């Protein structure tokens, strides 16, 4: 008698965290993986690897139930606009109708009493997931180390100059690979990780300290030049970004710079407990990506 393998749907599959999560899930032979994409064109890289795909558009509710058919577990990764609130609610409602049992949600930084705008939005989504009655695991990563390589479409370090909007704040960091590894583990063993909220960060550094490490490891001079958060806000306006979300980001840069976000440099020892592996430190990340940082 053949046992039916649990089927996991990964949203955000073409993004950094979702894509890496699929890479880690491929090592688990006790599950089936389905990648959610918005168009047949975006499905091609997955089908070439033998990974099943479904069309799922958060803004097109009619795609939800067909995409959820036969799915047991959901990795929920929403976009970076205020529309994430409506998208998340409707997605959860339809996931419940489809019989999905476990939801792993990729949220944002902060403790339960966080007051940073977009962090709070993610926590409201967490509460709705719980209210719907799913078994759940909430992931709350701190700042991605990948932002040291690029932020949006811009390089973060140009000719050895690192720009950021947080003055001399010490921030906590996590590698996207580590977040994805935790996501894969929790999706693979929902019983063990049910009801858990995992804040994820393995290292805390200022940008000055990061510049010093880059200088040592890359072998060329790096320096940090802080920028005003006003520059970020204007860039977002000029780019035509959805400003409800980006205004929250702007305000959180100001709070980082002023040192008014409690626990902004907190780190956690849960990665090893969850995965059995050592987490990535900033020095490890720079070593791994020194060719990209070279100039």
Task: Label the predicted regions.
Residues 2-45, 59-62, 66-71, 80-89, ...:
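Oxidoreductase cofactor-interface core, primarily capturing Rossmann-like NAD(P)-dependent enzymes
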Residues 53, 102-103:
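A short hydrophobic/small-residue beta-strand
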Residues 50-52, 136:
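Short, conserved active-site loop motifs that form the nucleotide-linked donor/cofactor pocket
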Residues 56:
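Cofactor-binding loops of NAD(P)H-dependent oxidoreductases
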Residues 2, 231-295:
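A hydrophobic C-terminal alpha-helical subdomain
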Residues 77:
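Catalytic metal- and UDP-sugar-binding loop of GT-A-like glycosyltransferases, i.e.
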């Amino acid at each position: 008698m053949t046992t039916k393998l649990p089927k996991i749907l990964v949203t955000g599959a073409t993004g950094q965290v979702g894509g890496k999560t699929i890479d880690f899930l491929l090592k688990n032979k006790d599950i089936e993986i389905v990648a959610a994409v918005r168009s047949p064109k975006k499905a091609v890289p997955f089908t070439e690897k033998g990974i099943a795909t479904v069309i799922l558009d958060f803004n097109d509710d009619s795609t939800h139930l067909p995409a959820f058919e036969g799915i047991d577990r959901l990795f929920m990764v929403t976009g970076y606009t205020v529309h994430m609130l409506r998208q998340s609610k409707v997605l959860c409602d339809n996931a419940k109708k489809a019989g999905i049992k476990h939801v792993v949600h990729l949220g944002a930084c902060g403790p339960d009493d966080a007051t940073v705008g977009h962090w709070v939005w993610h926590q409201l989504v967490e509460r709705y997931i719980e209210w719907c009655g799913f078994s759940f695991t909430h992931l709350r990563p701190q700042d991605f180390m990948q932002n040291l390589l690029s932020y949006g479409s811009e390089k973060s370090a140009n000719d050895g100059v690192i720009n950021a909007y947080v003055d001399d704040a010490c921030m906590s960091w996590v590698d996207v690979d580590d977040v994805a590894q935790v996501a894969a583990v929790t999706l693979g063993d929902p019983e063990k990780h049910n009801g858990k909220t995992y804040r994820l960060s393995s290292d805390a550094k200022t940008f000055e300290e990061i510049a010093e490490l880059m200088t040592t490891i890359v072998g060329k001079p790096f320096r940090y030049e802080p920028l005003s958060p006003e520059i970020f806000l204007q860039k977002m306006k000029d780019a035509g970004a959805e400003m409800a979300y980006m205004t929250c980001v702007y305000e959180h840069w100001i709070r980082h710079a002023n040192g008014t976000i409690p626990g902004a440099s907190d780190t956690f020892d849960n990665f090893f407990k969850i995965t059995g592996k050592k987490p990535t430190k900033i020095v490890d990340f720079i070593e791994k990506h020194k060719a990209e940082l070279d100039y």
